[in-house]
């Protein structure tokens, strides 16, 4: 569903992926980031009361480009139906730190997971 309806073009992690992401963003494209992934170049922020390596790209884009962040949650229902919840766009103040924004996004992700924990697909160690 994510690839078919939300994000048709998927960009790989890493420096070259970040460059491509930036190029697409500057050309007016919306971007979707899966922030529940463990990243080696991230920041250690609280995630379920433990420090977890977390991408700072959403926070960097919010600060550098005054970009809104729109959290999205997809819930699996019966018979191959899905419910898509689109949250109110988040705007952050110029003086908010990358760490504060990243931590806030982790808190939102925690709430999404706790809403339906059996639907969170987690195959790697975020706390490594």
Report each predicted region and the residues it spans.
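Membrane-interfacial amphipathic helices and adjacent loop/beta segments
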Residues: 1-15
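Non-catalytic C-terminal accessory region of glycerolipid acyltransferases
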Residues: 15-128
């Amino acid at each position: 569903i994510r690839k078919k309806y939300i994000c048709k073009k998927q960009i790989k992690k890493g420096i070259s992926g970040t460059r491509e992401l930036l190029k697409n963003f500057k050309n007016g494209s919306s971007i979707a980031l899966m922030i529940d992934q463990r990243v080696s170049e991230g920041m250690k922020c609280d995630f379920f009361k433990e420090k977890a390596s977390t991408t700072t790209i959403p926070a960097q884009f919010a600060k550098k480009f005054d970009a809104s962040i729109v959290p999205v949650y997809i819930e699996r229902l019966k018979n191959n139906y899905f419910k898509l919840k689109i949250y109110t766009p988040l705007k952050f103040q110029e003086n908010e730190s990358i760490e504060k924004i990243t931590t806030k996004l982790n808190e939102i992700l925690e709430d999404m997971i706790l809403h339906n924990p059996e639907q969170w697909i987690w195959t790697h160690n975020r706390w490594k």
